[in-house]
Amino acid sequence: MDADSINSFFLIGALLAAVSVLLSPMSSRLGIPILLIFLAVGILAGEDGLGGIQFDDYSTAYLVSNLALAIILLDGGMRTRVASFRVALWPALSLATFGVAITTSITGLMAAWLFDLHWLQGLLVGAIVGSTDAAAVFSLLKGRSLNERVGATLEIESGSNDPMAVFLTVTLIAILANVDTELSVSFMLVSFIKQFGLGICLGLGGGWLLWKLVNLSKLAEGLYSILVLSGGLIIYAVSNKLGGSGILSIYLVGLFLGNKPTRGRHSILNVLDGMTWVSQIGMFLVLGLLLTPSDLFDILLPGFALAFGMILFARPLAVWLSLLPFKSFSSRDRWFISWVGLRGAVPIILAVFPMMAGLPGAQLYFNLAFFVVLVSLLIQGASLTTAARLAKVELPPKPLPISRSGVEIYPSSEWEVFVYCLSENKWCVGEPLKRLSMPDGTRIAAVFRGDKLLHPSGSTCLEAGDILCVLGQERSLDALSHLFSQAPETKEVPRFFGDFFIETDVKLADLAPIYGLDLDEEASEMTVADLVASELGAHPVIGDHFQWQSLHWVVAGLHEGKVTNIGIRLPPET
């Protein structure tokens, strides 16, 4: 490649990236996933599009996609709270194993029938599109206030279901490439355990080593993110080389680092956020360039049948069967999880495997995977907000600071600066600072009024539009945000949580005359907390609800896993 070719490559790549960024606001206006914008730019620049760029280098696409996916999973792992595993780990693992196997089987049989394939070829198609995509799920769920059990289940599932899909895809390719191959059940079981076992061990072990290395190193601030990124990729590559799941390993590395006091954590997350965007843009641009849209016309009708069969039948059945042992999921939860079986980059990456193995019909597998991904992003991704509202798994938005940054004075520092802008409707406007009931361990460090810095004292009166810089820790975030942030609309919280709020240490007998409860002797001795435990089990989350004695009860507050407040909605005729 000469200098002119290199400059042309830089020019085209930068132009496509810039166009993708500038067009990204269209996603919210059109109600479509932003990943679809990136993919569309790549397709339009490709062979059948306006750009006319001919790109059919599957090896390069495989390299770029794997690198991008590794970075996205590292970032996603660092942003996942390990506390969410308390309510979502086992359901997510059930979906990541049994769910993928069921989806693969049903989708594979449909593909074999629709495209007149051998049943093994059909199963290969099912395996390729059988797993949800972490990049798509993390991207579309980021910033959404969902029921914790549902949101965490979807995120953990998407970060851990790729080993099953990779295992099934590689196994079926081996059988189809050599029809004389005899793969025993024991061999397949060992391979499966190896994928998961090595992936988990190397992810957690490597995460611990990398965490120690980061905290023991004294580097320039910008280098910590490079160390984490390179260390994560080393563990990803080693896991893959040894036959484990690199995808699972790097997700667990991120999970370990994100839930430990890590030096430079906030700067690492800021850098990874930018790297994740670059990865998503680069990956979907390359995958878009790889597609020749005219090839999809030949599979249009059966392709739609396959995609909708998977979305409306295979995925829901897999979810309902996989979640049968978990009674904490309501029917609405299960329907929403079924609908958010988003397909993205992973099926397309897996579809490259048969191309690189030289299997007959590999181009059909690739086109089918791409078609299913397009339909999934267009239909499921675009309707995510509506689905969450209909399933009632979306919580009222929490008030948040306009920005937050870490104060990393020592490796395990958890101090942060939260920045709030006071709106006119906050009760503290016009009040002196000494009248504020600040949470323990917090302090107002600075007050900005216009472009002036005030020196806050107890007599400083707050005004609408003031910018407050508050020093505190994450555990105080909810209390601070309710004190200073713009709250949700007043009608929104009662609509979701109910008409009245009560604390859970109140006895049901005290509520009986107010709400007309008919209590037996046992119920008369119960508190609201006892009622919640008997109705919802050991691990309730905010937004969980149940019907009892004609009243609708909704969990409205939690502290350290225990329900502190509950909302009560009266029956319509009351």
UniProtKB/Swiss-Prot annotation:
Catalytic activity from the UniProt record: K(+)(in) + H(+)(out) = K(+)(out) + H(+)(in)
Keyword vocabulary terms for this entry: Antiport, Cell inner membrane, Cell membrane, Ion transport, Membrane, Potassium, Potassium transport, Transmembrane, Transmembrane helix, Transport
Coiled coil: none
A single GO molecular function term of this UniProt record: potassium:proton antiporter activity
GO BP field: cell volume homeostasis
Bilayer topology annotation: Multi-pass membrane protein
The keyword Nucleotide-binding appears for this protein: no
Family annotation (InterPro entries): Cation/H_exchanger_TM, FAD-bd_PCMH-like_sf, FAD-bd_PCMH_sub2, Na+/solute_symporter_sf, NhaP2, RCK_C, RCK_C_sf, Transptr-assoc_dom
RCK C-terminal domain ranges (all copies): 405-486
Cellular location(s): Cell inner membrane
Chief place where the protein resides: membrane
Cellular component GO terms held in the UniProt record: plasma membrane
Residue ranges of the TM segments: 6-26, 30-50, 58-78, 87-107, 109-129, 173-193, 196-216, 219-239, 242-262, 271-291, 299-319, 335-355, 359-379
Pfam families the record matches: CorC_HlyC (PF03471), Na_H_Exchanger (PF00999), TrkA_C (PF02080)
UniProt function note: K(+)/H(+) antiporter that extrudes potassium in exchange for external protons and maintains the internal concentration of potassium under toxic levels.
PANTHER family reported in the protein's UniProt record: K(+)_H(+) ANTIPORTER NHAP2, NA(+)/H(+) ANTIPORTER 1
UniProt similarity note: Belongs to the monovalent cation:proton antiporter 1 (CPA1) transporter (TC 2.A.36) family. NhaP2 subfamily.
NCBIfam families: PRK05326.1-1, PRK05326.1-2, PRK05326.1-3
Stated name of the protein: K(+)/H(+) antiporter NhaP2
Origin species: Shewanella sp. (strain W3-18-1)
